[in-house]
Amino acid sequence: MGPFGPAAALLHWFTGVRMSPATLRRLTLAAGTTVRQIERDFSAAVRTTGGVAEAVADVPRQLSIDGSMVHLRTEGWREAKLLAIGNRGAEWPLTALSYAATLGTAAAFGDEALGELGRRGIPQASDVVTVNDGAEWIQGFVDLHCPQAHRVLDFAHAAGYLATAATATFGEGTDAGAAWFRGQRRELRDGDPEAVLAALAVLPASEARDTALDYLTARRTQIAYRDFRARGWPIGSGCVESGHKGVIQGRLKGRGMRWARPVAEGLIALRIVNANDRWTTTWAQVGPRQRADHRARTAARRTIRRARAPSWRPRWPGWTRCGPFLPI
C-alpha cells in the first residue's frame, strides 16, 4: 500500500476503475476502522476466554516489543508500539512472524495485542524468550501478558550504554575509548557480566558511567549473554526493529508526511493484517461488518427521529392541521 494518489493511478491502470485519491482515502479509512474494530472484538473475546479455541502448537517462540515515532497533524510526534512474535528454530531467521500495533498508550496496546497473543498461544506457551530494551512499559507488558517468558536485554541496547560510558570517560573518537569499548563489549557477549560491571565501577564517576552501571546492574539477570547463547536463545530484537521499518515506517514515515490519527490508525490496522498474511480471511469480514454497522446506525437514527416527531398524527390520509390536502 502506497500514497493515495499513486495508488489511485495503479488501480485505474490494472482494473480500469477510476477513483479520486480523496475517495480512495475515505474508503481506506473506513476499511481500516472496520478492521481495527474486528481485531478489538477478537481481543475482547480472548480476554474473556483466556485464549483461543483452536489448539496452538507449543513451539519455541520469541516475543519482542518496541516503539517508533509517527508524525500526527494535531498531536505532533507520537509513538507507534509494535509487538513481533516469531517461531524459533535451529536456523535463523525467525519463522511465522506476526505483529500487533497501536498508536495508543501502553495500556491500550496491551489490550489490543491480546488477540495476536492468543492466536499464537503465548499465554499457554512454555518456551518463550522475550528480547527487548529495558523500557518500563515493555517490562510491564511482559509481566502482565507473558510472565513465564525468559527475559533478555537486547544486546545492542546494552552495548550502547557501554559506548556512552566510554565516550564520557575517554573522549569521543579516541583510541583508548574504542579499545575499552571493544574489550568490554566482547566480555559482555562472550564472558562474565560481573567483569563488565566491575570495569564500569572503576571508571571515573560521571553521569554516563553511573547511568550505565545502574541500568545494567538492575538488569543483571537479563545480560548473561554467554549462557543465553549456549541455550540457543536470541540476544537481539531485530525482528521488531525490521517490523517497524517494513510495517509502520514504510508507509507512515515518508518525507513530509503528517497524519490525522484516525487515518494513521486505520492504515496501521490494514498493514498489520497484510503483514500477518490474514488479508483474505479478514477482508471477508469487512463487508458484512460494515453493512451490519450501517443497519445499526440507520435504526438508531430512525429511533431518534421517531422520538422527536410530534405526538399528533392525521386521522386519515390527506388530512392536515389546516384541513384536507387537495393536490390541485
Q: For the regions a protein language model found, what residue spans apply to each?
A:
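Catalytic center-proximal scaffold of phosphoryl-transfer enzymes
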Residues: 1-328
